[in-house]
A protein has these predicted regions:
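Conserved glycine-rich cofactor-binding loop
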Residues: 8, 15-17
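Residue(s) in the substrate-gating loop at a strand-loop-helix junction
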Residues: 147
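Active-site loop-to-helix junction immediately N-terminal to the catalytic Tyr of the SDR YXXXK motif
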Residues: 107, 153-161, 173
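Substrate-binding pocket helix/loop in short-chain dehydrogenase/reductase
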Residues: 102-104, 108-116, 208
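Active-site helix of classical SDR
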Residues: 127, 163, 171
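Conserved glycine-rich Rossmann-like NAD(P)H-binding loop of the short-chain dehydrogenase/reductase
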Residues: 29-46
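Alpha-helical segment proximal to the catalytic Tyr-Lys
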Residues: 132, 176-180
Length: 209
């Protein structure tokens, strides 16, 4: 059986959507999970739901808010997780940004930078912060939520797709380097889900075709 009892997990962007589902399922399978996004109130609602669902099991949820665009906030997320839960067994990099929908010819430079910083750099920084602990312990798991967009082209979310393709290569390189230390690094490439994040896509009937 799939059992995460005794494991601790950070899941970024877990106040809704895919991240919320990942955090919930990990807790239901015994993990202690950190629900994290920018808004503490939204995180607390999810954590309360998880704790209610897990009240008769080992799983539980705590809240540590974090703005992934801020390196100091990322380090605080890691440090506070260790302070409250003792260790980090699993890192799920799910949080991402896509502030622009349209031609790559029209994306403002600041929007381009935001996508690259939030979708690639923040994941890289978090991995740098947690891998040394995992390597020393000879055990750890990193999951980066990429996208089907990292594997195919788009006429309307090109910059986002570039960032998700980079995430896949980030995973491959980390797996090659730290796999021998039993630090397992994998990517998930979800298709189109009816989440708020992807609303501009699933509300467009032409794209759905």
């Amino acid at each position: 059986m799939f059992d995460l009892t005794g494991k601790t997990a950070i899941i970024t962007g877990s106040s809704k959507g895919i991240g919320k589902s990942i955090a919930t399922q990990m807790a239901l399978h015994g993990a202690k999970v950190v629900v994290s996004s920018r808004k503490v109130e939204a995180c607390q609602i999810v954590a309360d739901e998880i704790n209610e669902a897990c009240k008769d099991s080992e799983g539980e949820a705590i809240v540590i808010p974090c703005n992934i665009s801020d390196k100091t906030a990322l380090q605080m997320l890691v440090d506070e997780t260790r302070a409250q839960l003792g260790k980090i067994d699993i890192l799920v990099c799910n949080a991402a940004s896509n502030p622009f929908f349209g031609s790559m010819m029209d994306i403002p430079e600041d929007a381009f930078d935001k996508v690259m910083n939030n979708n690639i750099k923040s994941n890289h920084l978090l991995c740098q912060m947690v891998i040394p602990e995992m390597k020393e312990r000879k055990d750890g798991s990193i999951i980066i939520v990429s996208s089907i967009g990292g594997l195919q082209a788009s006429t309307v979310i090109g910059t986002y797709n570039i960032s998700k393709a980079a995430d896949i290569m980030l995973v491959k390189n980390l797996a090659a380097e730290f796999g021998p230390d039993n630090v397992r690094t994998n990517a998930i490439a979800p298709g189109l889900f009816k989440t708020d994040f992807a609303r501009a896509l699933w509300e467009n009937p032409e794209i759905l075709k």
